[in-house]
């Protein structure tokens, strides 16, 4: 038997602001073009043709994992990992609508283009 998960499953017992942040994030990504939400057991993958980001929900914030083809040096990055020669994952904490700013939008647009 295969377990299936929904986006809503990830917001059970979470602050309502976390869902609002997620919805704003999805709207931001949709300014670049279509995306698909792919809920997994522990995260929600956001895909174009391939995954461009992943979202882990926490009690009162989101942990956003952005894919890139280069290292991003920035204090907002709470964790960075080089997963292959030309692939990096960068985790960013999203705690308020102010965190969904132009800088983050630039990183997400790069990830969107990369996932083509």
Which residue ranges define each predicted feature?
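Charge-dense, helix-prone N-terminal extensions
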Residues: 1-116
């Amino acid at each position: 038997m295969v377990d299936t998960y929904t986006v809503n499953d990830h917001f059970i017992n979470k602050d309502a602001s976390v869902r609002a942040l997620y919805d704003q994030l999805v709207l931001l990504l949709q300014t670049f073009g279509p995306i698909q939400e792919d809920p997994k057991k522990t995260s929600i993958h956001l895909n174009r043709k391939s995954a461009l980001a992943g979202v882990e929900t926490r009690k009162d914030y989101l942990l956003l994992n952005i894919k890139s083809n280069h290292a991003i040096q920035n204090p907002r990055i709470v964790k960075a990992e080089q997963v292959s020669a030309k692939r990096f994952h960068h985790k960013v904490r999203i705690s308020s609508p102010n965190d969904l700013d132009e800088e983050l939008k630039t990183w997400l647009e790069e990830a969107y283009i990369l996932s083509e």
